[in-house]
């Protein structure tokens, strides 16, 4: 068996070693700049915590419904849904956020809207360096299962500067699937560095023509209803429809890493 004996490993143009080896016991230390701990900015992304209650029925409008904590259901004129913390989940997870249609709406009004969102404080999203020349990309990853196949819209909304960016993902079967959406960096409009709401991550389920009449805004720009949820399937068109979400993760950069489980 061959072996290589070294004291350290250093890049060709580097001044410091990337890996330093202890010659006595063979252990090593590494100079790591992309620390993988505390990278997920979403709170309760695994949907494990539901302190207010595990289920809320008869929902017809915006509210922080019982079910997994930190998530708000927004919208109106979508029919009626039940929200709950479900045990239906992909491998590696125990819970999910479930939306179940109990009164269908197959004929949406122009202002019909149903979305799930979590909002983040400005002091917690400073790593994106938004509004500077060093602005970073946003890597959003999540698991979704739905009995309603079709195109769904996810959005990042900057509350401080009234800006947004949107992307779509396609549910093509009724199984659990992991999705990764990489949103561009934004050199315009910095997030306020305080404990107020600065960034919301939104998942659309229903959208009337007031939100779908333009072209989907896939680059950062001024927030506008008409370009915010274009192509969104009508999840509320049947009482057979269910939508589940878990493993939600938002991190800095162009690569979505494995979900960061926290106790």
Task: Show where each model-derived region lies.
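Extracellular and organelle-lumenal recognition/adhesion modules and their flexible linkers in secreted
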Residues: 3-263
């Amino acid at each position: 068996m061959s072996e290589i004996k070294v004291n350290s490993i250093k890049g060709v143009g580097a001044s410091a070693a990337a890996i330093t080896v202890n010659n006595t016991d063979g252990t090593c230390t590494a100079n790591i700049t992309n620390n993988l701990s505390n990278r997920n900015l979403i709170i309760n992304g695994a949907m494990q915590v539901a302190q207010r209650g595990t289920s809320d029925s008869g929902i017809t409008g915006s509210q922080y419904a019982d079910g997994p904590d930190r998530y708000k259901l927004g919208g109106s004129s979508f029919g009626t849904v039940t929200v709950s913390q479900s045990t239906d989940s992909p491998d590696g997870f125990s819970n999910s956020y479930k939306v179940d249609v109990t009164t269908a709406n197959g004929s949406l009004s122009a202002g019909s809207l149903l979305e799930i969102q979590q909002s983040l404080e400005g002091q917690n999203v400073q790593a994106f360096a938004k509004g500077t020349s060093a602005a970073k990309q946003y890597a959003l990853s999540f698991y979704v299962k739905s009995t309603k196949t079709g195109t769904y819209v996810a959005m990042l909304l900057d509350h401080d500067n009234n800006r947004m960016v949107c992307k779509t993902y396609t549910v093509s079967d009724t199984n659990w699937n992991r999705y990764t959406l990489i949103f561009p960096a934004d050199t315009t409009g910095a997030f306020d560095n305080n404990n107020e709401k600065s960034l919301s991550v939104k998942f659309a389920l229903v959208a009337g023509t007031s939100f779908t009449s333009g072209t989907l805004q896939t680059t950062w720009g001024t927030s506008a209803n008409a370009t915010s949820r274009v192509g969104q399937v009508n999840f509320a068109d049947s009482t057979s429809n269910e939508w589940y979400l878990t493993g939600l993760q938002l991190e800095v950069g162009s690569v979505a890493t494995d979900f960061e489980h926290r106790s």
